[in-house]
Amino acid sequence: MVYLTLQKSQKVFAASRHLHKVAAKALEKSTPEETVTGSFASFIHNVRPDHLSDLVRHRSKRMILDSIGVGLVGSMTHVFDIALRYCQEIYSSSSSSPVSSVYGRRGLKLSPPLAAFVNGVAVHSMDFDDTWHPATHPSGAILPALLAASQMVPAASRPKGLDFLLAFNVGIEVQGRLMRFSSEAHNIPKRFHPPSVVGTMGSAAATAKLLSLNATQCGHALAIAASLAGAPMANAATLAKPLHIGNATRLGLEAALLAARGMEANLLILDDTPGCAGFNAFYDDYQPSPLTLSTNSHEFLLEKQDIAFKSFPAHLGMHWVVEAALSARNLLIDHSGSLSPSAIHTIILRVPLSKYINRPFPESEHEARHSFQFNACTALLDGKMSICSFSPDSLCRQELSQLLSKVMVEHPKDNVANFDKMYAEVTLILQNGDILTGRCDSFYGHWRKPLSRESLLRKFQTNASRVLPKDNIDNLVKTVDNLETLPDCSLLASCL
């Protein structure tokens, strides 16, 4: 038995030695900076605040403010309570220092990884967080990690607000670059939830930058994060989906902390190495390229591709169908002089084909947030959408059930499941045979029709006011607006 075990160990060692030789040969052909992974690590380590343009600073601060507001209102949800109780009860005897703030719980502190986890859950608890193209939720996977990490650094050496803003943009940039290595990633996902993959990598990159890891440690942080990434789309529209963001931000933070303590991993993790599955394990058409940084300037992806902010808490695709439904509703009122659901014979939705957001009769708030049918019919019935639209009382209305029973869904070939190209049409066929159609190509809040400063502030203030007094809300707005001048970035987390 001992002999057989020794034989197995020798085989494992030989196989491991072979893999190390393959990796070594690949590295021999180029310096670390010339590999894709090495270029990313070098970028994370070397990028400076003066590489941030005024536009990138402006857009990223809007993202930070919106994400904080979404996290604060998310701290009132059932799924957040479950996650918080879990961390408090299961890890109550943890030796980790409880130094990091929690959304909506003034005075409560958790260890940095646990604070990042519960705050990430809060951000995605209602699917109210921002969305980018290619499709992912970029801010929620990064901001909680940075807030938690900022409070764990000794007071005498804490990064400044400008360092925090740079680290945030590093995390956004890494996510965007990775998703652009695959055309598959541009469309509404089918297999795995993107922020659970690229968000984990972005969190690791952002935390590594904030904590000033060296280039090699940055590479190891990315490689470690890749081993902690992934979540299946089958858990969309369930209580488990917010865990995807919570885990992404926590595990990315932990990957950076492990790298800082000497943990090593494959420094070719982002390269397309023949015979070795690295980050290409997540995308069938993965074609990476180096992330270069010039001495004087760098064009961040956020400069070219703005973000989408949601006006109500639901999957981004719902925002097209709601605006189309509201347009059809107005046509019906103009046509008939009033809104009478009984006057509607059939409702036709022309939307992209995506199974997990095609839910004819949702039975929970999380299913409702991922239902074209529910959102279209609720908008027709109420003339608006809000947090209250997904309450149990709203879901159980008789008149809503009657409208849902009249819905037919069509998937035009030209309507692709892509947040940059999709559209929505809502056609009402009336009992008298008249036909009314509302259409939306770009909803208000989409990157082609960005929210105004006033609309973004109104959303933030409405969300934050559920848990914070007005003075605290005003202070948060000022702190984010003046983030570059903040002498200690942990002051932002202390405002929560």
Q: What feature does the model see in each segment?
A:
Residues 140-148, 198, 202-206, 319-324, ...:
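Short amphipathic alpha-helical face segments that pack within enzyme cores
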Residues 151-254, 273:
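Glycine-rich, mobile lid/loop segments that gate access to catalytic sites or pores
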Residues 2-6, 13-136, 233, 240-250, ...:
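Terminal-appendage/accessory-domain detector
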